[in-house]
Design a protein with these regions (language model features):
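Small-molecule-sensing regulatory modules
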Residues: 1-19, 32, 135-350
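Generic structural signal for residues in well-ordered beta-strands
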Residues: 13-15, 72, 122
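Short, charge-patterned binding micro-sites
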Residues: 21-26, 131, 142
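Short, structured active-site "lid" loops
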Residues: 27-54, 172
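Short, Asp-centered acidic motifs that coordinate Mg2+ and/or phosphate
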Residues: 52-56, 101, 185-186
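A conserved helix-loop-strand patch within extracytoplasmic ligand-binding domains
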Residues: 59-60, 69-118
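Short glycine-rich anion-binding loops that position phosphate/pyrophosphate groups of nucleotides
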Residues: 59-62, 192-194
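Short hydrophobic/aromatic-enriched beta-strand-loop microsegments
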Residues: 74-76, 120-129
């Protein structure tokens, strides 16, 4: 989308795929920003070095601190910002069985799930969107396929297994080949990521309510970073969506001022309505037992400074203590992971 919008302005665009492995990321960046943030920063450093004119990021993955001389040159129109519950049969959250197993590696989603359903068992879930869906769908599909094979061998009147297989979608066929590690009743994904993968209409989903599952700041948005004075004006004129920029600026300002970006479960959602930006923020303890939340209409005329004031009030209302506790947990986890293992939970996932 970014390339096509720039192409429409008769600007020649060449896409460069950058594969940065964990081994290539500086330890200092990983420690300070987390692995995802370190990857984002490594791309931005290529922009500042002149190796790239611009970098395209998922905004929710971007650290709130920006290097000097680097700016968000463009924010295209945002995709849906909320989360969806994905199950093999479209089950809603309140319909999940007691102690159901739900997959996510997002601190925020884990805490929000436990706040809504303390009985749930949350398990880590890694990989891209396709991989996560395959992990969810594999057990039930493999059981059904085996049932049809057994029925055929026993001479029972049942659908032919090969015919059943041809009726499956590609993601279901891939799931049939996947080795099952942990059986899950549901997983939580960003609606935007599922839509961009082209799989949204193929998978049963249920939107999670934004008032209790406040999205990650910037979720659903794309950010194009560039160095000041370079192609910034061209990018901004071609792709910038004013509403999306205002909303994401508010969300990221609240996150930056509250602090605790990659160590605490934090959700911030902003919606531009006329002369005000309706803003909701939610800071949770890791187990979801404590929730600090508030809403405020911020004047669009000074939305950034108003967002900073809103964040300061949140800290005074108890967010600072919740974040301090989260930091202690993160430091304890880091100490236990010094042997080289990855942490189980990350700040945010797909």
């Amino acid at each position: 989308a970014v390339k096509s919008q720039l192409d429409s302005r008769r600007r020649e665009v060449t896409l460069t795929e950058v594969d940065t492995t964990g081994d290539q990321l500086r330890d200092e960046l990983i420690h300070r920003l987390g692995k995802t943030g370190a990857f984002v920063r490594s791309l931005d450093e290529k922009v500042l070095a002149g190796d790239l004119d611009a970098a395209v990021h998922s905004m929710k993955d971007m650290p709130t601190e920006m290097p000097d001389d680097l700016v968000v040159a463009g924010v295209p129109e945002r995709a849906p910002s909320g989360d969806v519950l994905v199950t093999p049969d479209g089950t809603e959250l309140d319909q999940l069985s007691p102690e159901a197993v739900v997959g996510t590696s997002s601190l925020r989603r884990s805490a929000q799930l436990l706040a809504a359903r303390p009985d749930l068992e949350i398990v880590p879930l890694r990989g891209n969107v396709d991989t996560r869906l395959e992990k969810l769908l594999a057990p039930s599909l493999q059981r059904e396929h085996q049932r049809l094979v057994d029925a055929e061998e026993d001479g029972e009147d049942a659908q032919d297994p090969d015919e059943w297989f041809t009726e499956r979608t590609q993601i279901e066929r891939d799931a049939l080949e996947r080795r099952v590690e942990t059986e899950m009743d549901a997983i939580v994904l960003a609606e935007a990521g599922l839509r961009r993968s082209g799989l949204y209409d193929d998978i049963p989903t249920a939107r999670l309510p934004k008032n209790s599952f406040v999205p990650s700041p910037g979720q659903g948005a794309i950010a194009v970073t560039a160095s000041e004075g370079g192609v910034v004006e061209t990018i901004q004129e071609a792709i910038d969506h004013p509403r999306s920029r205002v909303e994401t600026t508010v969300e990221r300002t609240v996150l930056a001022e509250v602090g605790g970006g990659c160590i605490a479960p934090i959700g911030v959602s902003a919606i531009l309505q006329g002369e005000y930006v309706q803003t909701r923020a939610q800071i949770l303890s890791h187990d979801g037992s404590e929730v600090i939340e508030a809403t405020r209409d911020l004047p669009v005329a000074n939305h950034a400074s108003a967002a900073a004031d809103f964040a300061a009030d949140l800290r005074d209302r108890g967010a600072a203590e919740v974040i301090a506790e989260a930091r202690e947990i993160a430091e304890a986890d880091a100490d236990s992971d010094e042997g080289g293992a990855d942490t189980v939970m990350g700040g945010e996932d797909a």
